[in-house]
Amino acid sequence: MTHEELMTLWKSEESIAHIKGWDFSHIGGRYEEEDNLPWDYEKIIRGVLRDEMKLLDYDTGGGEFLLSLGHPYENTSATEGFPPNVQLCREKLSPLGINLRECSDASHIPFADESFDIIINRHGDFDPPELHRLLKPGGLFITQQVGSDNDRELVEAVLPGTLKPFPHNDLPEQKKAFEDAGGFVVDIPGYEQPMELIMVKGL
């Protein structure tokens, strides 16, 4: 294909790649990523979650993972800040009785002090002092994150010199932030895994 044809194809892909919630089916089969993390985010949560506990899923996306937990709706809360996902959550979560709040500022989450037994967060922003405020004594924060060096080799190949979007999202710095917030017993494992692009459209 010529350069012009490729550009036309890629722009066409860009125009239709509007992801809602946690649905990445549009790029299914276009990349491969090892799925052998030394932990299981869902299993960890299920291992400690009890029906009577107050649960918050911060940055819930489209609520897909939250709903998969099957937690009693009256004890379930969620936040989301991306407008298309907020609307999606209003349609999916609110009618069930889940307490949904629109929020895009991890330092000012609109819930009262000591509201939750467990706060979960997958790939969303977070602020340790705010988490400390929201959690009941003995409460838990469980998160799975992407580090500041995620896909760095690819970024440098395509856009050399691009600044890291989340330069502080690394294990030593985050460990210290939680310790400084007080009240946290920190267990932060890390893992690096490769990703292989099958098609440029997977970007």
Task: Specify the residue positions occupied by each region the protein language model found.
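A short glycine-rich, Lys/Arg-flanked "PGG" loop and its adjoining helix->strand segment in the class I
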Residues: F126-I142
